[in-house]
Amino acid sequence: MTENNEKVKNSDSANNQSSKNSKFNFNFEDKKVKCAKTILIIIFLAFLSFQMRAQTADMGFTTNEQYLDVFSDDNGRMYLTALDPYYYLRMSENYLENGHTGDTLKNIDGQQVPWDSYKYGPTGARATFNLLSVVTVWVYQVWHAMDSTVTLMNAAFWVPAILSMFLITPIFFTVRRITSSDIGGAVAAILASLSPSIFVKTVAGFSDTPILEILPLLFIVWFIIEAIHYSKEKNYKSLIYGLLATLMLALYPFMWSAWWYGYYIVIAFLVIYAIYKGISYNSIAKYTKSKNNNHKDKIESEKLEMLNILKISGLFIIGGAVLITALYGVSTTMNALQAPLNYLGLDEVSSQTGWPNVLTTVSELDTASLDEIISSSLGSIHLFAIGLIGIFLSLFRKVLTPVKQISNGLAEKLDIKYALLLIIWFAVTFLAASKGVRFVALMVPPLSIGVGIFVGFIEQFIKNNLDKKYEYVAYPTIAIIVLYALFTIYRADSADLVRMLLPSNYVPIAEGIMLASLAVLIIYKVAELIAESNKKLVMNKIFMILLAIGLITPTIATIVPFYSVPTYNDGWGESLEWINTQTPNNSVVTCWWDNGHIYTWKTDRMVTFDGSSQNTPRAYWVGRAFSTSNESLANGIFRMLASSGDKAYTTDSVLIKKTGSIKNTVDVLNEILPLTKSDAQKALKNSSYKFTDTEVSEILDATHPKVTNPDYLITYNRMTSIASVWSYFGNWDFNLPAGTSRSEREAGSFQGLQTYATNINDTLIVRSLIQQTAEYNIYTLIEVRNETLTGAMMAVTNDGQMQTQQLNMHKVKLMVNENGKSKMYNSLADPDGQLSLLIKVDKNSIIGTDGSNNPVYSSSSWMATANLEDSVYSKLHFFDGEGLDTIKLEKESLDPTANGVQPGFKVFSVDYGNYSK
C-alpha cells in the first residue's frame, strides 16, 4: 500500500470511527446502508432526468385552447416534435404489425428482406432494424394494456424520456470509480443528462436516435474502466467487465450507424495504455533486478495487471470486430474503416459523385464556432473550463514506478489511465463538434465526467486535509460559485424557481417517486450531519452540497420551462388524409425532403425523397422543378422521378456512359424532359453523342416511361422560407468548379411583407411595407383601376411627410379573388430590377373597414428575387396554380407552423398530358 493510499485509508478509518462514536447507533458506513443510499441516488437522478423531459407534454407554448387542439390528438396528447421521429414511428408501426420494420418483404438473392416501399419512391429501400422501434412497441404494449386509448404515437412520445433515465447510471459510477465521490458522480450525471445539446434532442416527443448515439458508449466506457480497475486482481471481474463492454459494442450498430467512433476511441485508449503498461512493467522489472530489491509481490502485481489489460484489449478489439462481422456482415466492418474519411468530407460543397452536397445546407451539420461548441455543450464557458480542469485532475492518482532518488527503488507517479481515456474521448468528440453542431452532444459526457472529477477531487482533498487551512480558500470559492448560480437564476427568471423543483406534473407517479427519493436522501443527509462529531467534516459536507447545487443550478435554469411545438398538426393531417383516401396506392408525393417522413407516415404513399435520402441527385431535380418557370420541364421532371426514379442518370445508365459526365447528362435531360416522346426521340437521334436506337429507347424508358405513377405535389409555408435552399440546388450550374462557394452560385428567395388592401372609389389599392427604419418607412403602392395596374414607391417619414418615386421592381404580379373567380395582373415595372412583388388579394374576405368605411380585404404579399417571380413554386403556393396548365390544386388546409398564406398547406395533382405521343 502506498503512502497516499495509506493516508486515504487512515482518513476513511477515522471517518468510520467518527460515525460509530456518533450520537446515533446507526452506522452510516455500513455496506447495506451505502448500497441503499446509492440506489436512492440513482432513482432520484433517473426520475429527475425524466421529469425535466416531461415538460414538453404540458404544451406550455400557448394558452390558446384552439391552437393546442391543432397540435394534439383526440385525447389531448401532444403530437411528436420535429421530423425524424415520424420515420421511427412508421418503422414502429411496421414492427408492431409485421414483426419487422418493413411494410413488406422483398426477395433479394433468395432471401426475404424487410423492405420500405414508401421512402425514395418508386424504388424503395431496405428497411433496417432499429432498437428505437422495438422499445417503442414494448412501451406501447405495456401502456396500451392498461389504457386502450393509448396509440403508438403516444408511446413513442415518451420513449426518449424513458431512455434518458439510463444516461445517469454509467456517468455516476464512472465518476465514483475515479473519485470515490457520490456527489461528484451525481453532479456529472445531472450535467450530462441536462446539458443543452443532449436535452433538446431527447425530450419527450423527440423520439429519435440521439439518445442511442450516446448511451452505448457511456456503458462501454464504464465497463472498460471497471475492467481496468480490477486488472490487478486474480479473479474474473476484469474479463467479465471486458466482455460486457464487448457485448455492448456489438449492440451499438443496432442503435447508430456511426458506432465506429466509440470503437476507435476505446481502441486508441487500450492500445496506448497497454503499451504504456508494458514499458512501465519492463522498467520496474529491470530496475529491481539490477538493485536486487525484494519487491516480488509488487512486480507480480504489475505483471498481472499488464497481462489482464492485454486480454481486455484483445477481447474488445478482436472480439468486438468478430461479433459485429458475424451479426451485421463484413460490409459493416469494412464500412467502419472508410466512414471516418467520409465524415471529414461533410462540408464539401460538391459530393464526390459530382452532384451537389445537400448536407452543406442541413442546419445541424453547420460548422460550429468555438463559442457555439462551448455554449451548446455544458451551457457555459465556466463549466466547460471546469470540465477540462477535472480531466487534468484525473491524473492525480498514484502508482508505483522506479526512480533512482528513492532508496527502496520504488516511488509513486501519476496514473494516466483515466486522463488518457478522457483526453482521447474529448479530443475526438471536439473534432466531431467542429464539423457540425449536431455532434456537440458527443462531447458532453467526457466534459461532464471532468466536472464530476473536479467536484470529487475537491471533496476528497478537503476531507483528507482537515487538519490544514485549505478550507479558508475552498469555502469562499464555493460560496462565490453558489452566489453566481443564484445570480444566474435571478437574471434568467426568478419566477421559475419552484418549477426547477417541480418541472412537470404531467406524470404524477414520476413526480412522486422523484420527490420521495429526494426527501429520503435529504433526511439521510441531515441525520448524517447531525450524527457527525467532527465539525470540520460537517462543514466540508455542507459546502460540497452547496458546490454541487451551484454547479448544476444554472444548467437546470436554462431548461425550465422548456416547450417544443410539434411540426405535424391537424391542418396538415387534413390534407395528408385526403391523399391517403383519395389517391391511387401507387401515387408518389413530391416536395422538398424535410417533411418526407411525415408524409410517408400519414399518407401511406411513396415520397420522392426524405430526411434519410436528401443527399442524392433528387435534390437537384426537385429544386429544379420548383424553381424553373418552364412548366413542361417541371412536369417532365415530376414524371421521371415518380415513375422511373434515378434510372436515367445512374452511374451505369446510357447517358452517363455515353456523355461521359454528370454535367452532360443533366444538359441532355433538361433538353428532352419538356418534350413529347417523339420530339425527345428526334432530339436524341440528332444529338452529337450519336445514340443508337437501342440507347434512345433505353433513355426514353426512363424519361418518358410507358407506365407512370401519379404524382402529387405539396407546398407549405416553411418551403417559402427555405426557398434559398431548394432554389440553390435547382439552379446548380454544373459548369462551375466543384469547390465554388455558395455565395458565387445562383439562388432565389422570398420575403413576406406587411400588406394592406382596400377599395377606394372603385380603385383597388394595395400597400406593402418593404423597409422600416427609425426615421421613415418605405412602401410599394399598387393600384388597379379600370383593369389597369400601376405602381409606385412611397417613403413616409415619422412626421407624416411623403415622397413618391418610380417603382423599381422587376415585375409586379397581382391575383385578385372575387366571387369565386381569380384574375391575374402582370406588369413589368423595371427591366433592370432584381426584385419582384407578388400580391394576393381576396375580396371575398373582408377583415374590416378603414376610417372612411371602405372595406379592408384579406391580403398578402412577398418580395421575390427575379429568378423566382415566375417559378412553378410561386404559381403554386402564392397563386394556387393560376397560370399553370398541367398542375391543379386539389386540397388545401391550415398551416400553423410558419407565417405565410392561409390555407398554407396545399396539395396539387400533376397531369402528364400527351407526353407519350
Swiss-Prot record:
Cofactors named for this entry: Mn(2+); Mg(2+)
Reaction(s) the record says it catalyses: an archaeal dolichyl phosphooligosaccharide + [protein]-L-asparagine = an archaeal dolichyl phosphate + a glycoprotein with the oligosaccharide chain attached by N-beta-D-glycosyl linkage to a protein L-asparagine
Cellular component annotations (GO), alphabetically ordered: plasma membrane
Domain notes: Despite low primary sequence conservation between eukaryotic catalytic subunits and bacterial and archaeal single subunit OSTs (ssOST), structural comparison revealed several common motifs at spatially equivalent positions, like the DXD motif 1 on the external loop 1 and the DXD motif 2 on the external loop 2 involved in binding of the metal ion cofactor and the carboxamide group of the acceptor asparagine, the conserved Glu residue of the TIXE/SVSE motif on the external loop 5 involved in catalysis, as well as the WWDYG and the DK/MI motifs in the globular domain that define the binding pocket for the +2 Ser/Thr of the acceptor sequon.
Primary gene name: aglB
One BP annotation, GO: S-layer organization
Molecular function, one GO term: glycosyltransferase activity
Record motif TIXE motif, residues: 361-364
Name by which UniProt lists this protein: Dolichyl-phosphooligosaccharide-protein glycotransferase
Chloroplast as UniProt keyword: no
PANTHER family in the cross-refs: DOLICHYL-DIPHOSPHOOLIGOSACCHARIDE--PROTEIN GLYCOSYLTRANSFERASE SUBUNIT, DOLICHYL-DIPHOSPHOOLIGOSACCHARIDE--PROTEIN GLYCOSYLTRANSFERASE SUBUNIT STT3B
Stretches that traverse the bilayer: 39-59, 155-175, 183-203, 210-230, 238-260, 264-286, 309-329, 373-393, 414-434, 439-459, 470-490, 507-527, 542-562
Family to which the UniProt record says this protein belongs: Belongs to the STT3 family.
Localization per record: Cell membrane
Motif (DXD motif 1): 82-84
